[in-house]
Amino acid sequence: MDSLEKIKEEVISCKKCKLWQFRTNAVPGEGYPKAEIMFVGEAPGENEDKEGRPFVGAAGKLLTQMIKEILGLERDQVFITNVVKCRPPNNRDPEEDEITACSPYLDRQIDIIMPKIIVTLGRHSTKYIFSKMGENFSSITKVRGKSYVWKYKEKEIIVFPTYHPAAALYNPNLRKILEEDFKKIRELAITPKRYTIDYFLGGKNRSWDKREKSDSNSGK
């Protein structure tokens, strides 16, 4: 029987792509095995490679802060991982062959956890999950801030793309957008069925579009 611990052991010893040659530690992911919210980034950075844990650098601290302050959850109440489990040299973008080799680990993690919500952080994780859903991906700017329903193995998982926390570290405007997206995630976590219905009635979460227009018109 598959388990998160088994996946962890396989990732730590994995040599399926060239990235194993450069790593200090592989980064399988961590968190609550029955988490309702799963965060998926692109790949580990320097700090993550040193510690063998996801999102422990500056971007990770921002993510942890938003999980606590906006979602009202502790970090160990969610699950955090990446599409690629080893750090690409010099923090370059992961390459397609690396994603192809490594993504089955993520697929298995999703199978085991079966979260209510998958939050994709940045374009690489969003593009990968969208490919699994059969959705077209254009850019993170165009798809972020909306919820999508993934019909997966007789279950509906809400997929919510947003910016990677690293992009918001030195950009106050992006940080504000990221914070607003996390407020939307909080509401989705509270009342997920409402947004599933909205999806089928009006497409990609029309309720948020209406609310944003209302807030804009009221000067909020």
Swiss-Prot record:
The keyword DNA repair applies. Uracil binds at residues 41-43, 55, 82, 164. One of its GO terms (biological process) is DNA repair. It catalyses: Hydrolyzes single-stranded DNA or mismatched double-stranded DNA and polynucleotides, releasing free uracil. InterPro entries: Type-4_UDG, UDG_Type-4/5, Ura-DNA_glyco_family4, Uracil-DNA_glycosylase-like, Uracil-DNA_glycosylase-like_sf. [4Fe-4S] cluster binds at residues 14, 17, 86, 102. It is an enzyme of class 3 (hydrolase). Removes uracil bases that are present in DNA as a result of either deamination of cytosine or misincorporation of dUMP instead of dTMP. Belongs to the uracil-DNA glycosylase (UDG) superfamily. Type 4 (UDGa) family. This is Type-4 uracil-DNA glycosylase. It comes from Sulfurisphaera tokodaii (strain DSM 16993 / JCM 10545 / NBRC 100140 / 7) (Sulfolobus tokodaii).
